Amino acid sequence: MEKQVQILDESGINRALTRIAHEILEKNKGSKDVILVGIKTRGVPLANRLAEKIKTIEGSEVAVGILDITLYRDDLTKEQLDPVVHGSDVKVDINEKTVILVDDVLYTGRTTRAALDALVDIGRPKVIQLAVLVDRGHRELPIRADYVGKNVPTSKEEIIKVQIKEIDGNNSVLLK
């Protein structure tokens, strides 16, 4: 039987996202010209939750976009060379805006690199920041998150599993 430990429960995730929302507002001096872009799959509902929290705190709407990085990944195996692409959906102009990429886990940095490539194909933001729910270390690329919900140092053999209610039916972060 596989041993797993719960790192964050629903209330822990909620507190982490509330703190990240406050940090985003503090660092950017409000929400003007801020756009949240969720990296498919679990980054999208996290970006939506951050937008709701920012609206509650600041009283203003923040645009949310969806980024599908499938075609930009450099770690696809030969079996995955024909990936199913669902498309990005960034309906607002990101030029000269502060774009915050949102993802569930930061590990090697390869997903973030692919997201950066996809984003610059859409436009030229003034600045790009990164918000992640969990940073587990083990970078292969020089990438650092601006906003981190929880740092969870892991071994390379361990797995962080983020469950999001909108996708998985419940909210938790597990270490396996």
From Swiss-Prot:
Keyword field contains Transcription: yes
Instruction: State which Enzyme Commission number(s) the record gives.
Output: 2.4.2.9
According to its UniProt entry, the protein's GO biological process terms are: DNA-templated transcription termination
Q: What InterPro entries does this protein's entry cite?
A: PRibTrfase_dom, PRTase-like, PyrR, PyrR_bifunctional
The top EC class, named as a word, is transferase
Source species, domain of life = Bacteria
The reactions it catalyses are: UMP + diphosphate = 5-phospho-alpha-D-ribose 1-diphosphate + uracil
Q: Which UniProt keywords apply?
A: Glycosyltransferase, RNA-binding, Transcription, Transcription regulation, Transcription termination, Transferase
What this protein is reported to do is described as:
Regulates transcriptional attenuation of the pyrimidine nucleotide (pyr) operon by binding in a uridine-dependent manner to specific sites on pyr mRNA. This disrupts an antiterminator hairpin in the RNA and favors formation of a downstream transcription terminator, leading to a reduced expression of downstream genes. Also displays a weak uracil phosphoribosyltransferase activity which is not physiologically significant.
Which HAMAP family does UniProt cross-reference here?
PyrR
| Protein family according to the UniProt entry | Belongs to the purine/pyrimidine phosphoribosyltransferase family. PyrR subfamily.
Assembly and interactions?
Homodimer and homohexamer; in equilibrium.
Q: Indicate what this protein is called per its UniProt record.
A: Bifunctional protein PyrR
Organism for this UniProt entry: Alkaliphilus oremlandii (strain OhILAs)
